[in-house]
Amino acid sequence: MQSEESIMTDLATSEIPETDPFALFAEWMEEARASELNDPNAMALATATPDGAPSVRMVLLKDHGPQGFTFYTNAESRKGEEIRANAQTALLFHWKSLRRQIRVEGPVREVAPEVADAYFHSRARESQLGAVASDQSRPLEDRRVFVDRFRAAQERFDEGEVERPAYWTGFTVTPQRIEFWCDRPNRLHDRRLFTLSGAGDALSWTSTLLYP
């Protein structure tokens, strides 16, 4: 059994390295894929209206790297409308199996149409038809109406390629702040914040430890 003195000695060293935040994110995501039972790429997406009224929901991360963190959705949904009105967003990844979380903050931009097309057509056909049938975030009088819309989409496209609706697209959050958190004994948790600074070719990431 580890002694209290040994535990305290270990706690004096951060377990979150001062490194490339995107490489660290990729490493943690791979570990999450190996340990989380469901949807390790699930993330909470927070948006807000221009006057600051917030809303949050779970979405799935579909791409990540120095370019940002990408997800896909109906642009006419509540989140889509809020993104168009206020580009500032925040993401949260929480992996209970690893006792870790990552927070991301930054503006969001829409992906190119060809990128949205490629991802849309990589999805299961039923998911494509569901996107066509769903009037996301709008009132639904009866579930049977939704099923009827799905069947109508099936008939419309028959065996042909399902056309991506113009309102269905992708968004990429360009991070300006990325914070990594991990659980440690005695609630002396580990936090490291990476902040983007500079401009143009002089952009760089700086990191600092935070009190938990």
From Swiss-Prot:
Keyword terms of this UniProt record: Flavoprotein, FMN, Oxidoreductase, Pyridoxine biosynthesis
Pfam families reported in the protein's UniProt record: PNP_phzG_C, PNPOx_N
GO molecular function: FMN binding; pyridoxamine phosphate oxidase activity
Pathway recorded for this protein: Cofactor metabolism; pyridoxal 5'-phosphate salvage; pyridoxal 5'-phosphate from pyridoxamine 5'-phosphate: step 1/1; Cofactor metabolism; pyridoxal 5'-phosphate salvage; pyridoxal 5'-phosphate from pyridoxine 5'-phosphate: step 1/1
E.C. numbers: 1.4.3.5
Enzyme class: oxidoreductase
Family statement drawn from the similarity comment of this UniProt entry: Belongs to the pyridoxamine 5'-phosphate oxidase family.
Name of the protein in question: Pyridoxine/pyridoxamine 5'-phosphate oxidase
